[in-house]
Amino acid sequence: MPQLSPRVQALVQPHLRDLDVYDPNFTPTRINLSANENTYDVPASARAAIDEALAATHSNRYPDPLSNELRDELAAWHGTDRAHVIVGNGGDELLYNFLLAFGGPGRTLAICPPTFSEYAFFASLTQTDVAEVWRDPETMLADEDALVDAAGKANLVILTSPNNPTGDLAPVALVRRLCEACPGLVMVDEAYGEFAAPGSSCESLLDAYDNLVVLHTLSKAFALAGARCGYVLAAPDVVEALAAVRQLYSVNVLTQAAALTAVRLRDEFAPTVAAIVSERARVLAALRELARTRELAVWPSEGNFLLVRVPGASEVRQRLRDEHSILVRDFSYAPGLADCLRITVGTPEENDAVLAALGELLPAAGPSDSLQALS
């Protein structure tokens, strides 16, 4: 918090004084492919039902603090019961509560960077130590044996599948090994799971491992990022612990109404998910073709985004914004992601625009260009 006055700086808890305000530097642009949102929006038929549900919702009343009607619907969808489900204000609240309830001074969280930065951030808020098992800088894949070894020495593990921003899946067999190795809890963040190959979810392990926690969100496949609704599937005692530390009324009545309607109409979102998966394959192929003549590398992904490496990534990001009104996420500042940009898979028109812009902006590849080999 470098901008604080000396008076307030002295009042802030010591372990929080070096934190910065989260500012993704969003800029109004013609095309925003920076935040892994679902750029297709909610299907029209589902949107009409959500609007009807919102109109019937009384905002003068406090919400059900446990979102029980929504919990029941989510439980029915996932083949379990309410006791195994907790709802939160987006996945972020549930991630923070996970570290708040089970982390803390003297405890260690194992993660596998590059990955979602909020894991380490919430660990710092709760004074939880972090053990980092870095991915291979070329393949961006995890060192599974090293991660299992770290899990055996940690209190908590968080693994993302598909991983943000690298896009790779955590094999179910690896999750099984982590659950067996870790003396505490293993969370698998499946925020992008709907875009992944069928059968890749680790939910099938929940009955066998009571230390497994699976995180989901309605922000991605359900196009409800602005509503802020996530949920966790876990053993009942884990759910109880998470419920005990949560803020009261954190999921408001409008979010509960919208989420309940969306989950009931979940089949209507399947065509959009299929379209994004199809576009992801098309954009990946187009980027690989572009890499034949431009300095570019791209990694395959199971999410609704692709990670690319280009020379001068920060400048490319700025020129995309300034010259083409296209916003992508610059990760070149992050350890392990030098010269990397993350591009959300959008509509065909949005994807065509970013492909054309990259073809214009990127330098021609030399005969011995090493970036192409990474793709």
Where are these regions (language model features)?
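Short hydrophobic/aromatic beta-strand micro-patches
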Residues: 233, 307-309, 344-346
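N-terminal "arm"/small-domain region of PLP-dependent enzymes with the aminotransferase-like
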Residues: 1-61, 152-153
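PLP-dependent aminotransferase class I/II
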Residues: 43, 211-291, 297-298
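Phosphate-binding glycine-rich loop
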Residues: 68-108, 310, 314
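Conserved PLP-binding catalytic core of the aspartate aminotransferase-like
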Residues: 277, 281, 290-324, 373-375
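PLP-dependent enzyme catalytic core of the Aspartate aminotransferase-like
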Residues: 173, 322-323, 333-375
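PLP-dependent aminotransferase-like
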Residues: 101-159
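Active-site pre-lysine segment of PLP-dependent enzymes
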Residues: 124, 141-153, 165-186, 190-224, ...
